[in-house]
Amino acid sequence: MPIGGDVKADQETSGSRSIKRIGFGFIGGIGYDITPNITLDLGYRYNDWGRLENVRFKTHEASFGVRYRF
């Protein structure tokens, strides 16, 4: 089961005001072999990109996949 994370920081200057932002994310997933050649994948990703002014930017992503190996 893969699990990961990431942290990003950014700084902007707007006029005489400095803006600092930090974001982070987490991912996780699992694969299940239903036959020797076919795997079902299920994954989730969360990102929090921080706040800009009074708005918070977050994303949630779920994924489902089928892999075929030859």
From Swiss-Prot:
<dbReference type="GO" id="GO:0009279">
    <property type="term" value="C:cell outer membrane"/>
</dbReference>
<dbReference type="InterPro" id="IPR011250">
    <property type="entry name" value="OMP/PagP_b-brl"/>
</dbReference>
<comment type="similarity">
    <text>Belongs to the opacity porin family.</text>
</comment>
<dbReference type="GO" id="GO:0015288">
    <property type="term" value="F:porin activity"/>
</dbReference>
<dbReference type="Pfam" id="PF02462">
    <property type="entry name" value="Opacity"/>
</dbReference>
<protein>
    <recommendedName>
        <fullName>Uncharacterized protein HI_0414</fullName>
    </recommendedName>
</protein>
<dbReference type="InterPro" id="IPR003394">
    <property type="entry name" value="Porin_opacity"/>
</dbReference>
